[in-house]
Amino acid sequence: MTIELATKLIAHCASQMNARYKKVVFDEWAVIALSGNKGRLLAYFGPRKSDFQKNFLKDAGALREGLLAGDANVGDFEFTRHSVGTGFESFMVLGRGVFLICNNTVQSMDAIAQDPLWLGAQVPFVELSDKFRQEPVVLRE
């Protein structure tokens, strides 16, 4: 899958999640590539693009180990429940070394999950992960 198609699928997923949750679930979505000690921002939607890049390692917080370990499979995702502010709430593996970062810059995942509508809002997210399992993102050199 191309980055262009991936970003369209991500935007559609975000729209579905927000509709089911009746408010914005994640106000920040980023597709990144990690290789060795280098990272590249491939796509971004949110309120703080330059700060996202500048503060990436700090904001990765509790998710940093999972992101950098490199042992997750395509389609796998991880959440942290107690990250607040600009700390990332989730990541999903889109392809080899390619990740989706999801963040709510206002609420923690714990606060989001307390709303009963969160259960239904998760469905599009899981469906998105299945799409990447079937067709991972492949970066063109």
Report residues per predicted region.
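An N-terminal domain-start capping segment
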Residues: 1-4, 57-60, 119-128
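A charged amphipathic helix-loop-strand protein-protein interaction module that recurs
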Residues: 3-16, 42-87
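Generic non-transmembrane alpha-helical segments
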Residues: 9-20, 24, 119-124, 128
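Short N-terminal helix-loop-first-beta-strand/juxtamembrane motif that initiates sensory/input modules
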Residues: 19-39
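Short glycine-rich, low-complexity/disordered patches
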Residues: 23-30, 74-81, 134-141
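Hydrophobic beta-strand residues in large extracellular and virion-surface proteins
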Residues: 31-32, 41-45, 91, 99-101
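Sensory/regulatory domains in signal-transduction proteins
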Residues: 70-117
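Juxtadomain coupling helices with adjacent low-complexity linkers
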Residues: 106-141
